[in-house]
Amino acid sequence: MKKNFFILFIISSFCLAQKIDEKKIFRGLPKGYYAAIVTDFGTIVFELYEKQAPKTVKNFVDLALGKKKWVDPYTGKKVKKRFYDGLIFHRVIPNFMAQTGCPKGDGTGGPGYEFEDEFYEGLIFDRPGRVAMANRGPNTNGSQIFITVVPTPWLNKRHTIFGQVVKGLDVVEKIVSVPRDFRDKPLSPVYIRKVLVKRIK
């Protein structure tokens, strides 16, 4: 009996230690619209460019918070639940970027729909920490996103930028540096624990 109680205590303590402190994550940030990706390696916080890419930001937020229906790739049925929580970073390349947002975990999945690009004049891949939509050609955005760790000017006008990392770029650096296979997939899964969204007024 005492042994079982001790095990339960340890599990409870671990769960409390793993609790996500949303206030701490967004503390100290100026007025704006933000998202945070909580991972095994730490938390990545980025500003959402709602003015420059309104459709893209709304799509990301609605999927993240479970406000939008998407097609489960395994059942073929439409579901309405939090999309990104529990997904992995399925593609990581050192000195380039980390990619996530595939419900199948192999880069071939999406939400079951596509939408058009949003290119805002002057918003380019001129710095690390750009958050953008992955695609397979013009106007094929869905749910997959990537975060850069270096300037990537060759991606200008090819991928919609909808955010900029403001905290946790070092976390992205850690993720892109993990051992990976020939497809650039991490040998040990890097999970998204939760995606948070916060508007600071």
Region spans (language model):
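Sec-dependent N-terminal signal peptides
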Residues: 4-13
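Cyclophilin-like peptidyl-prolyl cis-trans isomerases
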Residues: 15-201
